Amino acid sequence: MEKVKIYGDAVKNMPWKEKPEGFDGVVWRHDNNPIIDWNPTKKSARIFNSAVLPYEDGFIGVFRADHKNGRPQLHLGRSTDALNWDIEDEEIHWVDEQGNDYQPSYAYDPRLVKIEDTYYIVWCCDFGGAALGLGMTKDFKTFVRLENPFIPFNRNGVLFPRKVNDKFLLLSRPSDSGHTPFGDIFLSESPDLVHWGRHRRVMTKGGQGWWQGTKIGSGATPIETSEGWLMFYHGVSGTCNGFVYSMGAAILDKENPSKVLYRTRDYLLTPEKEYETTGFVPNVAFPCATLQDPETGRIAIYYGAADTYVAVAYAQVDELVKYIKENSELVDGDDVEYK
C-alpha cells in the first residue's frame, strides 16, 4: 500500500509515544493516563468527552465539565503540550448573534473544528430535549451561538473540517428521548450552517461485531487523508452489567462521505484499564478529538474514560489505515450511494 497522506498543517509539538515493543495492536495508550483526573476545577467534579485543537503556539480545548451539582457545562482550557491543561474555573459565556446572553441550561460532549478562519463548536444542549447546539468563535474570547441544526432528539454532532462540494457537512445520531433506540450515524449538508438537508444514513449499528450492536456515534472530527476521510467513532454493546463503549474507525469516501469504504470489524480500543472500567459510568472509551501531524503520520486520540477522565491514545496513519482496510466489515446500508 502506498504511503497514506494526511492533509492539513503540521503539528510538530503534539503528544507522542512510540508503540510498546511486542504490542500487536494499532492503537496504544499514553503511559500517564488519565491526563485529567477527578475535581479538576473548583466547580467541576469530572472532565471527560472533550475536544482539543492546535492554537497559536500551543493548544486550545473545549471541555465537558460536570459540575458538583451534577449539571454539565463547557469550559475552556489551554496547554503548551496538549497533556497538561489549565482549565478555566468558569464555564464558557455564550451570546446570540445580536450579542445578548444565551447560556445553555446544560452542555456536554463538545466537538471542536476549525473551518477556514473560524472555530466551530458542536455540543449537546437542551432545546426542548437533547439536541445539537452550534456555536462559533474567532478568538476564544467571544462565543456566539448559531441556530440549532436539528430538532430533538440528536447527539454526537461532528462537523467536517472543510466544505465538500461547497457544502458544510455534519455527522449526527438521531435518537429518541432515551437516546438508545435508532443508533445509526447520519450525514447532513448545509450551504450556510442554518438550512440543513440531504440527510443520508452513513453507518449502521450491528453486523458481526457485537461491540457496536446497540448503537454507534461519530467521534472526532474526520481526518482528510489520501485514502478518504478517516473517522474515529464509538460503538456500544449491551451487557448484563450495562453498556460498554469501545472505539472503532472507518474510512469514508472523500467526495461522497455518506458512503463507507471500510470500517473496523473489531474494536480498536475497549475499556480495560482501571480508569476506563471504573468511574462515574464504568466501561467507557469515548473518542472526541484527535491531533495529527501530516509530516510524521502520527495521530493522538483524545477520549473520555468512564465518564470521569480524559485519556489519550496513539496511532500511526499508515499502519492504522492498512489495518482498517484489511479487517473491514460493512453492515447493511453502509455502502449505499445515494443519488
Summary of predicted features, one role per range:
Residues V284:
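Aromatic sugar-binding surface patches on proteins
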